[in-house]
Amino acid sequence: MISNTYKIELPYASVFKESWCLVDIETEGRFWRTSRLLAARVITYGSPLEEYEWIAERESDEYDILSELAQVLMRSSCILTFNGNSFDLPHLRKKYQAYRAQDPTKGKKTLDLMRALMPYKFMFELQSYRLADYLSLFHGKYDIRNDAEGALLVSSLLELSNLFTLPDTSCEAGMLEQEGESKKIFRAKWKTPDEMPIAIEIFDEVFHLTSCGSYVRLEITCDGSVLRRYYIDYENYDFLLAEGYAAHRSLTAYVADDRKEKAVRTNCFSLIPVSSVFPDRPDRLKKYIQSVLVYMKRGIDRPFDIEDPV
């Protein structure tokens, strides 16, 4: 058996903390009974992070790899994986059971990055959502030796949730005239506490959000002199067809059914004058921008879905 230890310097999610570890295994096939364990890698939290790697040279090395891996997992409280709740962890449990050895994954919480990143899909232009697809977003900026290091790097994408929280720092804002059109553009710019792992661009017919490094820019197309303010609890609103905006059902109870319809995420908004949030109302400006960010982030919310021990 070949054993290696590395110091790791890669971006990673802030959720990865003390007593956590990241695990990845390589096997000959998918079925545990007929598939030999070829390698196992585990990255542990520290300053810097450490990676332990065990590679089989012969068939009998499988048990030794499992034994070495168990010593590290026993010291961990939560196991981070990429698609590990579907493959790596069930495979390991079966292997330990087959050798009649204590299962080091028992009683550990787990976080599967593949599942945790699902709400972020709208932010990426990917044909599929395998580890290699997520790694392509980094454009080869980092040297990755194996899938364990790849999963660690991909975990940093969870930090993109910070794009949708306006920091306490000041926010630059202004109104731009759009050449050749009657519509106007409302633009806001601010700095995030930490640099984002990748550049991001999100847009629809009204909003356009871009991020590069630690700077975020939000552009909003105005309907004349008004802005759309969205509400996330759209199930409590009706969209008024003639008026072109949504109102709470406590206010629409007596509106005829043919003049309203149930609001959905994309039309659950009210219209507010630009002058009410700009230029000399910083408190209202921040409140308005935050409402837009809450609308744009969709299903991205913390805490992450950390699964309880099995």
PLM region descriptions:
Residues 1-310:
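DEDD superfamily 3′-5′ metal-dependent exonuclease/proofreading module
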